């Protein structure tokens, strides 16, 4: 008999004794025979199994309170849980006889395909070359095609920064041109030689004519030419230019020399455009881009200039210089068009129209007899409201400005003399805007687009497969895009796909302009014969733009028929 110790509780058991009792209970429960499954399952569960409903595994009888045989205890079933509410997993094994058949693929396995079918508005400037989006190889569904099938692409006036062509046939013919082929391509470009390739080339690698034409289609003209600086794009290029050598940034004399040479080149380009010896050219500044087009292109009988994006300050400066312009994407409202038609309306006329609109807006208050109770906004408030509306569209596609006819010459002088054309601080300080042209001009330097054939991985049903691809990088202008597609149509037997990466501020150049009369295309082509473009390219650029504020982003050619998305 244990001695009575003060403060000792008789019900207290030492740890070894507790462990011994637990082992004894586990052995006694394991010895008891578990009842059959049919008896332990509730009637509702048996009915659900017969109906083929997915059920959770029913816990064993000995699972409550601990596992049998000293093993881990089974999870207790929630008595309030529904029998059919568990999430369905793709790799889950079948639970009942009704699920023995193999199931269809789980819907979320195709989510990547669905996302790819919705072409994104914006693409990264550069992606990994070894991974091509699957969308460039899928066929277009009917609602996604913006127009009927066509043998030609719509005209696209945006500048592309990168093209990625893919095909089932190799592009090895585009690599390692011979010295004679490279020289012949340069001569063909300088002499504007018209080359017509056959519909299909059996062996592109042995076709010297194809390789020379490919070299010809990669040439463009640039000013200024500074090989250590990326001169396109200029908008948002400060980070790429940071740390680069720029001796003119703090040298006013050198800046003056650069701007003088740039003014001569700019004037030379405009004179070529006016005489229809140059079809178009671009002026790329650090804030906006200007597209000058010759008369006859884009359905216009006059020289046109599009500026995008613009700000209220730039538009006010153009008004002060007497430049008549309009905002094509701003619709008419009330008595006047909400455009900045510089000198079409004088200040007095605009003020009179504004006062008339204000009187009409408050006329209904007088009819109700409450005009004295409503505080009429003063002229200053109305002016501030209008200025806020103008500022809100700054740097947006809606701020694109259109200049026509003789006003383009006034715009030329305005840009040459404008102090805000060149950055005064930052990596681009003192650097003149970039001039891009498809033909030679005074002070221009011949440049080449970079081309290389690579292999890309595309997702297939059995994993990944190799696809032949051709990558083009650089400032790809509209004539180069059309020339390359014509060339690849012959070399790839009328079948390829392409992903296009546009310079976003230039996508708005595809807007349709309101024309005064319909042009005779035969006369237009005859007048622009010496502009240096292939007749087929000239015919395409003469068409009225149809893409609006968007640009081509994906193109698929199958059996010489184009489908595209913008």
Curated annotation (Swiss-Prot):
Q: Could you tell me what induces this protein?
A: Expression is cell-cycle dependent with highest levels during S phase.
Q: Which InterPro entries did the record assign?
A: Donson
- Bias regions of kind Gly residues — which residues? 62-72
Q: What is the effect of changing residue 292 to L?
A: In MISSLA; loss of nuclear localization
Query: Which parts of this chain are annotated as the region Disordered?
Result: 1-110
GO biological process: one example? nuclear DNA replication
Q: Where in the cell is it found?
A: Nucleus
What, per the annotation, is the impact of changing residue 28 to R?
No effect on nuclear localization; complements loss of endogenous DONSON by rescuing the spontaneous fork stalling observed after DONSON depletion
Coiled coil start-end: none
The residue ranges flagged as biased composition, category Low complexity, are 73-82
Subunit-level organization: Component of the replisome complex composed of at least DONSON, MCM2, MCM7, PCNA and TICRR; interaction at least with PCNA occurs during DNA replication.
Which PANTHER family does this entry report, sorted A to Z? DOWNSTREAM NEIGHBOR OF SON, PROTEIN DOWNSTREAM NEIGHBOR OF SON
**What's the protein name?**
Protein downstream neighbor of Son
Q: Which organism is it from?
A: Homo sapiens
Lineage of this protein's species? Eukaryota, Metazoa, Chordata, Craniata, Vertebrata
């Amino acid at each position: 008999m244990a001695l009575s110790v003060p403060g000792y509780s008789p019900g207290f058991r030492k740890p070894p004794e507790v462990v011994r009792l637990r082992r004894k209970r586990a052995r006694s429960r394991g010895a008891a025979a578990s009842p059959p499954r049919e008896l332990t399952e509730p009637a509702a569960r048996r009915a659900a199994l017969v109906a083929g409903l997915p059920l959770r595994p029913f816990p064993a009888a000995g699972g409550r309170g601990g596992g049998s045989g000293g093993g881990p205890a089974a999870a207790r079933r929630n008595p309030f849980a529904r029998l059919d509410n568990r999430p369905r997993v793709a790799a889950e094994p079948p639970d009942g006889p009704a699920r023995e058949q193999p199931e269809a693929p789980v819907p979320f396995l195709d989510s990547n395909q669905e996302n790819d079918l919705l072409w994104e508005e914006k693409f990264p400037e550069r992606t990994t070359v070894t991974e091509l989006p699957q969308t460039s190889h899928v066929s277009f569904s009917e609602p996604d095609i913006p127009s009927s099938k066509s043998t030609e692409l719509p005209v696209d006036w945006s500048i592309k920064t990168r093209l990625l062509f893919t095909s089932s046939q190799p592009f090895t013919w585009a690599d390692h041109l011979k010295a004679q082929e490279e020289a012949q391509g340069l001569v063909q470009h300088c002499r504007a030689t018209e080359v017509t390739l056959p519909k299909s080339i059996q062996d592109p690698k042995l076709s010297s004519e194809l390789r020379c034409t490919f070299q010809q289609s990669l040439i463009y003209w640039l000013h200024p030419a500074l090989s250590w600086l990326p001169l396109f794009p200029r908008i948002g290029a400060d980070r790429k230019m940071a740390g680069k050598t720029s001796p003119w940034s703090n040298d006013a004399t050198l800046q003056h020399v650069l701007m003088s040479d740039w003014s001569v080149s700019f004037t030379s380009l405009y004179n070529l455009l006016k005489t229809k010896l140059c079809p178009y050219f671009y002026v790329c500044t650090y804030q906006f881009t200007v597209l000058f087009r010759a008369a006859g292109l884009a359905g216009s009988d006059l020289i046109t200039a599009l500026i995008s994006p613009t700000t209220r300050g730039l538009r006010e400066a153009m008004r002060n210089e007497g430049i008549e312009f309009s905002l094509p994407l701003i619709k008419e409202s009330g008595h006047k068009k909400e455009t900045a038609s510089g000198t079409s309306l004088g200040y007095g006329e605009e003020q009179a129209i504004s006062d008339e609109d204000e009187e009409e807006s408050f006329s209904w208050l007088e009819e109700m007899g409450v005009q004295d109770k409503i505080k009429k906004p003063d002229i200053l408030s109305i002016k501030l409201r209008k200025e806020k509306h103008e500022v809100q569209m700054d740097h947006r596609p809606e701020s694109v400005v259109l200049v026509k006819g003789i006003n383009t010459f006034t715009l030329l002088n305005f840009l040459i003399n404008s102090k805000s054309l060149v950055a005064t601080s930052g990596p681009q300080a003192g650097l003149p805007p970039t001039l891009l042209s498809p033909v030679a001009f005074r002070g221009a330097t011949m440049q080449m687009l970079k081309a290389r054939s690579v292999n890309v991985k595309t997702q297939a049903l059995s994993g990944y497969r190799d696809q032949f691809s051709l990558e083009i990088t650089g400032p790809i202008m509209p004539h180069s895009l059309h020339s390359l597609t014509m060339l690849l149509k012959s070399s790839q037997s009328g079948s390829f796909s392409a992903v296009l990466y546009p310079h976003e501020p230039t996508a708005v150049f595809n807007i349709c302009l309101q024309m005064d009369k319909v042009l005779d295309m035969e006369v237009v082509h005859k007048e622009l014969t010496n502009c240096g473009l292939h007749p087929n390219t000239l015919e395409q650029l003469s068409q009225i733009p149809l893409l609006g504020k968007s640009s081509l982003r994906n193109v698929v050619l199958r059996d010489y028929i184009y489908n595209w998305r913008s």
